[in-house]
């Protein structure tokens, strides 16, 4: 769900020689030098840039990467698209996204040449979850949100394909009658939730489905959400209402809004689902506030970010019932194998 209800969420490249950028300095001008940089022999206008040659980045490959980045920074949007097209990369998106995409392509190629045996740091699978919950217009503070749609989209990070999906509606028990606002927003009808199972039964089905995919046993995986509220609020409250302990597999997750903002260097205000799609050159596919459709669109953003060179990592967790950030510098870890949580006493 997004924030209309007043909340935050609502070929083997290593075998190829990477083109090395060349910079030719012209004669010095009065104060500063000017350069003409070339990517694959094609000129782009530019001015002087400075690189560091100390510390861990003293290896020549990092100097090459810095030179390449300087050239890319001075390319026009048309030049960026032409270069991306040449490498058969996605050409949609705003200029800053295109620059980031091209920079990460060159960086990845150069580092692969430097360390041909580099280990893939991604999870095998990412489970995208975007709950829909009961709601009322104005989002009153005392209202208890109950999950009414539990979708899961299984994204294979190696093939970058959606491998499978799960979806079940959930029968609310505290506020069993959906508000007209909720029906209009989510498209979920009273009849659909009346005929659905209660949350504990649906959670059991979700866990059985995840086990059938060998998540946490054969394959490393993690949860990904669009914001913090799905896990820290909706699932947390629902487990309390259903007298269940919070499931261990959902205690840590990737908040894609944080990942997107940090990777593309954009403010929090530009990390809403529809804005992220727009900035990446994509349109929303499906019905907004359908949990399954939202999850599929979030998966599309995750795929584009992985293609652009982002290492999606767990960045949030629930600890002692409190939402906390997780440092991106920590080693990549997967979620534990899913197990049905015990009942609360």
Swiss-Prot record:
Domain Exonuclease intervals: 126-302
EC code: 3.1.13.1
Q: How is the cofactor bound?
A: Binds 2 magnesium ions per subunit.
Spans annotated as Disordered: 1-40
User: Which cofactors does the annotated protein need, by name?
Assistant: Mg(2+)
Highest taxon of source? Eukaryota
**EC top class, in one word?**
hydrolase
One Pfam family of this protein, by short name? RNase_T
Q: Where does Mg(2+) 1 bind?
A: 130, 132, 294
SAP domain ranges (all copies): 72-106
Entry GO CC: cytoplasm; histone pre-mRNA 3'end processing complex; nucleolus; nucleus
Please summarize the record's notes on activators and inhibitors of this protein: Although it can bind simultaneously with SLBP to the 3'-end of histone mRNA, the presence of SLBP prevents the exonuclease activity.
Query: Where does the record say this protein resides?
Result: Cytoplasm; Nucleus; Nucleus, Nucleolus
The catalytic residues are 132 (proton acceptor), 289 (proton acceptor)
Q: How does it assemble?
A: Identified in a histone pre-mRNA complex, at least composed of ERI1, LSM11, SLBP, SNRPB, SYNCRIP and YBX1. Binds to 40S and 60S ribosomal subunits and to 80S assembled ribosomes. Interacts in a cooperative manner with SLBP to the mature 3'-end of histone mRNAs. Found in a ternary complex with SLBP and the stem-loop structure of the 3'-end of histone mRNAs.
Question: Which PANTHER family does this UniProt record tie to the protein?
Answer: 3'-5' EXONUCLEASE ERI1-RELATED, 3'-5' EXORIBONUCLEASE 1-RELATED
- Reported function: RNA exonuclease that binds to the 3'-end of histone mRNAs and degrades them, suggesting that it plays an essential role in histone mRNA decay after replication. A 2' and 3'-hydroxyl groups at the last nucleotide of the histone 3'-end is required for efficient 3'-end histone mRNA exonuclease activity and degradation of RNA substrates. Also able to degrade the 3'-overhangs of short interfering RNAs (siRNAs) in vitro, suggesting a possible role as regulator of RNA interference (RNAi). Required for binding the 5'-ACCCA-3' sequence present in stem-loop structure. Able to bind other mRNAs.
- Record note on domains: The SAP domain is necessary for binding to the stem-loop structure of histone mRNAs and to form the ternary complex with SLBP, but not for 3'-end histone mRNA exonuclease activity.
The name under which this protein is listed is 3'-5' exoribonuclease 1
> Which organism was this protein described from?
Rattus norvegicus (Rat)
Q: What is the lineage of its organism?
A: Eukaryota, Metazoa, Chordata, Craniata, Vertebrata
* Gene name, Swiss-Prot/TrEMBL: Eri1
């Amino acid at each position: 769900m997004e924030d209309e209800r007043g909340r935050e969420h609502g070929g083997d490249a290593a075998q190829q020689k990477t083109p090395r950028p060349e910079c030719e300095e012209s004669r010095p001008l009065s104060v500063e030098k000017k350069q003409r940089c070339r990517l694959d022999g094609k000129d782009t206008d530019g001015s002087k840039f400075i690189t560091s040659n100390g510390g861990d980045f003293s290896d020549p490959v990092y100097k090459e990467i810095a030179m390449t980045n300087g050239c890319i920074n001075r390319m026009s949007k048309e030049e960026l698209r032409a270069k991306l097209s040449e490498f058969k990369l996605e050409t949609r998106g705003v200029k800053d996204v295109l620059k980031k995409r091209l920079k990460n392509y060159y960086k990845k190629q150069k580092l692969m040449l430097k360390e041909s045996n580099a280990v893939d740091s991604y999870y095998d699978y990412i489970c995208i979850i975007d709950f829909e919950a009961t709601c009322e217009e104005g989002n009153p503070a005392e209202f208890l949100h109950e999950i009414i749609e539990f979708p899961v989209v299984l994204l294979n990070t190696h093939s970058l394909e959606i491998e499978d999906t799960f979806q079940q509606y959930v029968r609310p028990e505290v506020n069993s009658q959906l508000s007209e606002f909720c029906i209009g927003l989510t498209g979920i009808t009273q009849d659909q939730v009346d005929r659905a199972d209660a949350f504990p039964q649906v959670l059991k089905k979700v866990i059985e489905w995840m086990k059938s995919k060998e998540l946490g046993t054969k394959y490393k995986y993690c949860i990904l959400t669009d914001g913090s509220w799905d896990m820290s609020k909706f699932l947390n409250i629902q487990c309390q209402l259903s007298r269940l302990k919070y499931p261990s597999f959902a205690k840590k997750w990737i908040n894609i809004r944080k990942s997107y903002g940090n990777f593309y260097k954009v403010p929090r205000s530009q990390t809403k689902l529809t804005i992220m799609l727009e900035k990446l050159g994509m349109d929303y596919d499906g019905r907004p506030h359908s949990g399954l459709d939202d999850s599929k669109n979030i998966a599309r953003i995750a795929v584009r970010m992985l293609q652009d060179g982002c290492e999606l990592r767990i960045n949030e967790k629930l600890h002692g019932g409190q939402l906390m950030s997780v440092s991106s510098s920590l080693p990549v870890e997967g979620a534990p194998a899913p197990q049905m949580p015990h009942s609360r006493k």
